Regions:
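Reductase modules of NAD(P)H-dependent flavoproteins
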Residues: 2-6, 140-235
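Ferredoxin-reductase
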Residues: 1-91, 147-149, 172-175
Length: 235
């Protein structure tokens, strides 16, 4: 890992009312693994600096200098609302990374894959799904994605068109769409029924702290060993 690098914003994509995907060009980017993140540093005209961490949403381009970050604008936040809506395309920030070596998955990690995400916690999980699709892995993969309402789903179009071998299940905690067979509510043991067996499945859980702790307890109770569960939390 090197120090701070200049990163130029090249594209902003709306995911939800407050969620954005930001694409940056980072000269001499060293590459990264699915699940890793970066630190982003902003410097004001008076020299004041603020640093925040954001997950990488896509696997590394082969020899490319492009990175894609997911940013959820936090109400009253100092940095995320500015990045989400106000940083001009063409402007530069600084990034450090890639960071993190625990919450990562690569196509060499064979076996069934169970991904569980809450809200914007789907961002690093999306990098894993995209890397899996690019590798043409034949191992089964399941995504359980918990959001408050249908309009808070990140990457909705891409998830609707999930590739063969990927099962996507959306879980709504506050407002379920009309016709949904599952009532709105937090994830429960019943939601884990029919998931890949605990014996050889790799589990990745990402989301707010309370969500991750709750899901971790459910997985352990369902027989998934602690050595098979990797977590990333925020908030």
């Amino acid at each position: 890992m090197h120090g701070w690098r200049r990163a130029r914003l090249t594209e902003r994509t709306k995911q939800t009312a407050t969620g954005r995907t930001l694409t940056f060009e980072v000269p001499h980017w060293p590459g990264h693994l699915p699940g890793q993140h970066v630190d982003v540093r902003l410097t004001a005209d008076d020299g004041y600096q603020a640093v925040r961490s954001y997950s990488l949403a896509a696997p590394a381009d082969a020899g490319g200098d492009r990175i894609e970050l997911g940013v959820q604008a936090a109400f009253g936040g100092e940095v995320s609302p500015y990045l989400a809506d106000d940083l001009p395309v063409g402007a530069e920030v600084e990034v450090m990374g890639p960071l993190g070596g625990w919450f990562v998955w690569t196509p060499q990690d064979h076996g069934p894959l169970l991904l569980i995400a809450g809200g914007s916690g789907v961002v690093p999980v999306m990098a894993m799904l995209r890397a899996r699709a690019a590798s043409a892995s034949g191992d089964p993969c399941t995504l359980l994605y918990s959001v408050r309402a249908p309009d808070e789903v990140w990457y909705a179009t891409e998830l609707d068109a999930a590739t063969e071998g990927v099962r996507v299940r959306l879980l709504y905690t506050r407002t379920a769409p009309e016709g949904s067979r599952r009532p709105a509510g937090r994830i429960t043991t019943d939601d884990l029924l029919g998931m890949p067996p605990p014996t050889d499945t790799r589990c990745y859980v990402c989301g707010p702290t309370a969500f991750v702790e709750h899901v971790g307890e459910l997985l352990l109770a369902a027989g998934y060993g602690p050595d098979r569960i990797r977590t990333e939390r925020f908030g």
